[in-house]
């Protein structure tokens, strides 16, 4: 049986190069196979469990945007139950605080400040639960020893009257992480456009790695809708992933068919869900893939007007080796990279990676 890797290699040889000469129609499956081959070559195969996974592992949903949210497909749609992930807009960095702290430090030390901006979705919905995930860097033994003498973590909120304590309870979390469950009386804090949290942890170490960034998890449900809101919700949603770039692509005015025959930069909206990688590559959910496509015969508008009595002289593309066939390809040095965020443990940690030379900027017959 031919493996998936061999099949991708075969499709890659068939496509030869995304920016090379192609027929009048570039098969979408071949483009997707080329894109998958480029991603696998740059990032390697995804190191993840299967779709089922270990039932004992708590899987966090995709965290791809500040204030972004996703609906639980298992819940009835009319309930509008959702889960939102909030990353801090700003926060204390390791340049501002020491990397290690001792047991005899003063209470003012070990204070981490984070500014959150709850989205309009969260502020317009009813919060049913909220947790703050914070990377302590401490093992379970250190956490137990600290809790036996004094609370390891204290959470405060900055208000007009100064810092105020936030009622929380410590829950179960993965190693070196603390999960603080906010009490119901603290849920109204998420209705403010700006939320400044101060977390005091004298024993915690400061880390500037992206995968240790703290975040808020908020479960929300819709408030009682009005008649107008119910009518708007009845409108079917867009069944495909979209982005602002894809929306601009759909809103472009139609072009002449002849413009697509000559060498030009084509675009294809590709989602990682379509590639089967939405549990591996969590941001962006989709992107616009640009590639070169079309023939290299001179377009009619560029041909010189015929002169009576003079035989026409064929126009040759510039910068070609004599006898070589021109090819629609990307200009050297014009390829752009794509930055993605991946996870290999279901959402507990993230990794920022770069796929080089993926998106074409300029095309020409060379």
From Swiss-Prot:
Tree of life domain: Eukaryota
Propeptide: 21-63, 64-233
Gene Ontology BP terms: hemoglobin biosynthetic process; male gonad development; negative regulation of follicle-stimulating hormone secretion; ovarian follicle development; regulation of cell cycle; regulation of cell population proliferation
GO CC annotation terms, alphabetical: inhibin A complex; inhibin B complex; inhibin-betaglycan-ActRII complex; neuronal cell body; photoreceptor inner segment; photoreceptor outer segment
Post-translational modifications reported in the UniProt record: Proteolytic processing yields a number of bioactive forms, consisting either solely of the mature alpha chain, of the most N-terminal propeptide linked through a disulfide bond to the mature alpha chain, or of the entire proprotein.
InterPro entries for this protein: Cystine-knot_cytokine, Inhibin_asu, TGF-b_C, TGF-beta-rel, TGFb_CS
Disulfide bonds: 263-328, 292-363, 296-365
Glycosylation: residue positions: 147, 269
Pfam families: TGF_beta
Signal peptide from the UniProt entry: 1-20
Keyword Phosphoprotein included in the entry's annotation: no
Molecular function terms from GO: growth factor activity; hormone activity; inhibin binding; protein-containing complex binding
Family label: Belongs to the TGF-beta family.
Described function: Inhibins and activins inhibit and activate, respectively, the secretion of follitropin by the pituitary gland. Inhibins/activins are involved in regulating a number of diverse functions such as hypothalamic and pituitary hormone secretion, gonadal hormone secretion, germ cell development and maturation, erythroid differentiation, insulin secretion, nerve cell survival, embryonic axial development or bone growth, depending on their subunit composition. Inhibins appear to oppose the functions of activins.
Name of this chain's protein: Inhibin alpha chain
Organism the protein comes from: Mus musculus
Lineage: Eukaryota, Metazoa, Chordata, Craniata, Vertebrata
Underlying gene: Inha
């Amino acid at each position: 049986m031919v493996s998936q890797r061999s099949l991708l290699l075969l499709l890659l040889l068939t496509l030869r190069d995304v920016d090379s000469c192609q027929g009048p129609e570039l098969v979408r499956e071949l483009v997707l196979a080329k894109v998958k081959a480029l991603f696998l070559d740059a990032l390697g195969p995804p190191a993840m469990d299967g779709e089922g996974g270990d039932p004992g592992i708590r899987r966090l949903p995709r965290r791809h945007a500040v204030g972004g949210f996703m609906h639980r497909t298992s819940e009835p749609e009319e309930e509008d139950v959702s889960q939102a992930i909030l990353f801090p807009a700003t926060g204390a960095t390791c340049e501002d605080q020491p990397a290690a702290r001792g047991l005899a430090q003063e209470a003012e030390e070990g204070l981490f400040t984070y500014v959150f901006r709850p989205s309009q979705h969260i502020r317009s919905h009813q919060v049913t639960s909220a947790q703050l995930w914070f990377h302590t860097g401490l093992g379970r033994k250190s956490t137990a020893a600290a809790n036996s003498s004094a609370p390891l973590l204290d959470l405060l909120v900055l208000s007009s009257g100064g810092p105020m304590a936030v009622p929380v309870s410590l829950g179960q979390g993965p190693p070196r992480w603390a999960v603080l469950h906010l009490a119901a009386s603290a849920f109204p804090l998420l209705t403010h456009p700006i939320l400044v949290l101060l977390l005091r942890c004298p024993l915690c170490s400061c880390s500037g790695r992206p995968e240790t960034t703290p975040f808020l998890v908020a479960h929300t449900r819709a408030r009682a809708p009005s008649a107008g809101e119910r009518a708007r919700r009845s409108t079917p949603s867009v069944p495909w992933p979209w982005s602002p770039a894809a929306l601009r692509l759909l809103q472009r005015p139609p072009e002449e068919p002849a413009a697509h025959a000559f060498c030009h930069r084509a675009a294809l909206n590709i989602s990682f869900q379509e590639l089967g990688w939405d549990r591996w590559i969590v941001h962006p959910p989709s992107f616009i893939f640009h590639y070169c496509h079309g023939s290299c015969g001179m377009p009619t508008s560029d041909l010189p007007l015929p002169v009576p009595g003079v035989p026409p002289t064929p126009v040759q593309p510039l910068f070609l080796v004599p006898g070589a066939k021109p090819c629609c390809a990307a200009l050297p040095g014009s390829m752009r990279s794509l930055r993605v965020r991946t996870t290999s443990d279901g959402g507990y940690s993230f990794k920022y990676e770069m796929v080089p030379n993926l998106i074409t900027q300029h095309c020409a017959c060379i």
